């Protein structure tokens, strides 16, 4: 039930790749690009926070081992089933369609069509077309290629599918305690509820 830290490292790479792609596309200064990178960072660091929290709130067992806080660990994993997908979506948005439509390296090296590819697929003048294509291929691999197996589907089902975490959150969430806190603040006595008429009770609801 302690799962999620590895996804943050991959997320850092993907966020960095998206930022480089924005530079190479000449769009890094656009406000919506900046906002997407902020959102990606926010989601990724939230996963990191959850991982740190469930570890810091862990406790020592009788055998001398340490176990993470089960509620926070399952909250972490539940977030892992969602956030990487949104991070990938934003990376694809920033990268642009060329990420999946770019010609092959063989085409780029071709004596006849290579110069045309170099000319028409260049982004900013200071960056080579080859470097632009390299960063897009990296994003493609993390979002859709072989690396996506570990970042997307494994995030969904690794260490338990989403419903497994929800079962544990329901068990560990201590809802009865939360209800008691609310009743205390509202000065509700269970005994007094007996004297409330049915019609009055419905009006509260």
Predicted regions and their residues:
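Alpha-helix capping/hinge segments and adjacent helical runs
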Residues: 71-193
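Secondary-structure edge/capping motif, primarily at the C-terminal ends of alpha-helices
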Residues: 19-28, 51-62, 94
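Short, charged, amphipathic alpha-helical segments
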Residues: 34-38, 67-74
């Amino acid at each position: 039930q302690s799962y999620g830290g590895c996804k943050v490292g991959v997320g850092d790479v993907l966020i960095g790749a998206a930022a480089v792609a924005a530079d190479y596309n000449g769009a890094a200064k656009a406000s919506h690009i900046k906002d997407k990178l902020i959102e990606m960072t926010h989601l990724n660091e939230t996963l990191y926070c959850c991982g740190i929290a469930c570890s810091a709130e862990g406790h020592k067992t009788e055998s001398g081992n340490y176990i993470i806080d089960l509620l926070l660990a399952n909250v972490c994993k539940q977030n892992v089933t969602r956030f990487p997908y949104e991070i990938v979506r934003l990376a694809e948005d920033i990268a642009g369609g060329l990420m999946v439509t770019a010609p092959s390296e063989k085409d780029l090296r071709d004596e006849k069509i290579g110069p045309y590819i170099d000319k028409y697929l260049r982004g900013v003048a200071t960056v080579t077309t080859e470097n632009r294509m390299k960063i897009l291929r990296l994003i493609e691999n993390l979002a859709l290629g072989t690396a996506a197996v570990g970042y997307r589907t494994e995030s969904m089902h690794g260490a338990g599918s989403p419903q497994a975490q929800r079962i544990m959150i329901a068990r560990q969430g201590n809802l009865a305690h939360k209800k008691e806190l609310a009743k205390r603040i509202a000065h509700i006595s269970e005994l007094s509820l007996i004297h409330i008429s049915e019609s009055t009770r419905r009006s509260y609801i």
